[in-house]
Amino acid sequence: MALRKNRGSRMQRNVIAMTEPKSLNSEQYRTIRTNIEFASVDRQMKSVMITSACPGEGKSTTAANLAVVFAQQGKKVLLIDADLRKPTVHTAFFLENTVGLTSVLLKKSSMEQAVQASNEKHLDVLTSGPIPPNPAELLSSKWMKELAYEACAAYDMVIFDTPPILAVADAQILGNVADGSVLVISSGKTEKEQAAKAKEALATCKSKLLGAIMNGKKLSKHSEYGYYGTKDNFMQK
């Protein structure tokens, strides 16, 4: 129990846009938000998938913080934990995870019943729910597309936190469900070859790559998380 509590506390600290909204790091997330909003000029972005090349690159932290800054804009936001293998969104917001995405896909609950309100105004969360034995099959079902359609009809912005795209097929399955995708790469950790393969994988599943975010780059000696999110680092395809 102590280990789980510590993990949750660490995740909570990483949602810096909520805990320290005036910090430099939070401002970088708002810059990313603006880039996402203007990434597609032909239509409004209603849903975005956040993924990474490999585990541990910060995609869940990025998804949580982006959800918060969109909500702080006054938009009605839904953050969906679609990482059905190693879900963490519920720990970030200290939510129960007995009912969630898997419950909805298995028709054990409606989306309305499964969604939970967060402590951030305008931000709701659909946690992963119980980890299933067949994540890819669930995510590729027609029920997933129906859920995405229902979510986009009810919310101004829907953000999907998905598994790393090179690790499993799940992110590729969801690639054409969301209006666009954002690739998170870790400074000093993600190899160029891995980033290139991740980009190719997104192209293969016909996902509209909005850009890439460099995570973990020190902005200053006072920056604990070191988040790169300026226009130059939000790289268009």
UniProtKB/Swiss-Prot annotation:
Pfam families per the UniProt record, alphabetical: AAA_31
Gene3D superfamilies: P-loop containing nucleotide triphosphate hydrolases
Record keywords: ATP-binding, Capsule biogenesis/degradation, Exopolysaccharide synthesis, Kinase, Nucleotide-binding, Phosphoprotein, Transferase, Tyrosine-protein kinase
Keyword Protein biosynthesis: no
Residues with Phosphotyrosine modification: Y228
GO terms assigned for molecular function: ATP binding; non-membrane spanning protein tyrosine kinase activity
Coiled coil region boundaries: none
Site (Required for activity): D81, D83
NCBIfam families, sorted: eps_fam (TIGR01007)
Entry superkingdom: Bacteria
Reactions it catalyzes: L-tyrosyl-[protein] + ATP = O-phospho-L-tyrosyl-[protein] + ADP + H(+)
InterPro entries linked: AAA_dom (IPR025669), Bact_polysacc_biosynth/exp (IPR050445), P-loop_NTPase (IPR027417), Wzc-like_C (IPR005702)
Role noted for this protein: May be involved in the regulation of capsular polysaccharide biosynthesis. Autophosphorylates in vitro. Phosphorylates and activates in vitro two UDP-glucose dehydrogenases, YwqF and TuaD, as well as the DNA-binding proteins Ssb and SsbB.
Enzyme class: transferase
Post-translational note: Autophosphorylated in vitro, which inhibits ATPase activity. Dephosphorylated by YwqE in vitro.
Outcome following mutation: Y228F: Prevents phosphorylation and increases ATPase activity
Native source organism of the sequence: Bacillus subtilis (strain 168)
Protein name as annotated: Tyrosine-protein kinase YwqD
E.C. number(s) listed in UniProt: 2.7.10.2
GO BP annotations, alphabetical order: polysaccharide biosynthetic process
Record family assignment: Belongs to the CpsD/CapB family.
Lineage, top ranks: Bacteria, Bacillati, Bacillota, Bacilli, Bacillales
